[in-house]
From Swiss-Prot:
Organism: Escherichia coli (strain K12)
Primary location: membrane
HAMAP family, per database record: MltF
A GO CC term assigned to this protein in UniProt: cell outer membrane
Name of the molecule in the record: Membrane-bound lytic murein transglycosylase F
pH note: Optimum pH is 6.5-7.0.
BP GO terms, sorted: cell wall macromolecule catabolic process; cell wall organization; peptidoglycan catabolic process
CDD domains: MLTF-like, PBP2_YfhD_N
Gene: mltF
Amino acid sequence: MKKLKINYLFIGILALLLAVALWPSIPWFGKADNRIAAIQARGELRVSTIHTPLTYNEINGKPFGLDYELAKQFADYLGVKLKVTVRQNISQLFDDLDNGNADLLAAGLVYNSERVKNYQPGPTYYSVSQQLVYKVGQYRPRTLGNLTAEQLTVAPGHVVVNDLQTLKETKFPELSWKVDDKKGSAELMEDVIEGKLDYTIADSVAISLFQRVHPELAVALDITDEQPVTWFSPLDGDNTLSAALLDFFNEMNEDGTLARIEEKYLGHGDDFDYVDTRTFLRAVDAVLPQLKPLFEKYAEEIDWRLLAAIAYQESHWDAQATSPTGVRGMMMLTKNTAQSLGITDRTDAEQSISGGVRYLQDMMSKVPESVPENERIWFALAAYNMGYAHMLDARALTAKTKGNPDSWADVKQRLPLLSQKPYYSKLTYGYARGHEAYAYVENIRKYQISLVGYLQEKEKQATEAAMQLAQDYPAVSPTELGKEKFPFLSFLSQSSSNYLTHSPSLLFSRKGSEEKQN
């Protein structure tokens, strides 16, 4: 997946130019016959979206996601409530605009020339490319030329349909495809994994997140170059909503909120390792059920799944692990650290987990209050890995190089510099393996995303199977029958507890239309 960057310069320039051009329509509160006035009179901003791991999702009824978070802040900016309608596919989203059922579409939609003929785009905030995917072990196409409708299926309203049509007319006359009116891109990727479908096309971000749970999904080839992602609103000559959006995004850019949201949802790294992800998910099935009670017992300020991800990064959940430098155990503690924590046996899993949590809490307590709450854990983990003194150096170096020392996105970019003499020679605490600390935190974030998504996928599958069995055996409750037939369901029973503090999780939902009020 190509590295994603929010287009801050573009947002700022576009906001300035359009604010001037649209100035006559900006006094939103003074007119009763414009779109902003209507939204404020109604008291709610109506946003239509779709369930994807990045765009909009829920845990325990609590919504989150990149587009949801931005939409909620925009509603707050306008002083109204947010009403979210979830649709099954992109085609239904644009139906909402056409029928007057939505003010905005916030769903990771790509900007293209066909859409802007009929709808008003907002500022772009990240970019994606469209990619053809297949299942590992199956035939990998090197070109679209010979694909047929029996092999290639895409979601309705997908932006790539226009690209496919152009390719058919100019380069691949034999190319054909089918549009499945009942499924979205995530469901079609599931069909590829399950062998029901040979190929589909999705955007690079969706694919990257999907692979964290389904590593057997592979990219065959890029269909397009990077394309900007934006929101859409009605194109009706009323520019008040567009002006408000530009002002909002420009303000978010200037105060650093856009950068923090990018880091939260897109900052976990681009590199996908098929073997490593597959090995990790196998360990989730084989090893984690025995360790889960310990992680739950000692996880206090952090989610137990984050603690599990840390332990896997440290030792691959091996209580007997030993490194050449002498660190040992589940949490790979040094002898001195273990002694300071009162640990008598570093290879005892419970002692090691307990000690590791206390040491991490100590690092957390040292992180300055100026660091945003949901980023403090990443600073603490880097300090856990390389020592808090070197974290102080990293923050100081960030400030000296015109970055924000309270922003994890800025600080992590400077971590590798701690091992380069031109930089560490001028720092208080000298040389550090900053590149290792960078990789350490990024790996933990990847394992965390995989773990949460995989557990939710397992829970969904077990629940669906239990419900099916309940239909066959109506005298037995679905829950008890599921636990009897699928013991893994007991392990998963609490896996959907609150997980919104530190980063987004994954849930490849099959829900159709629904509405949420916030």
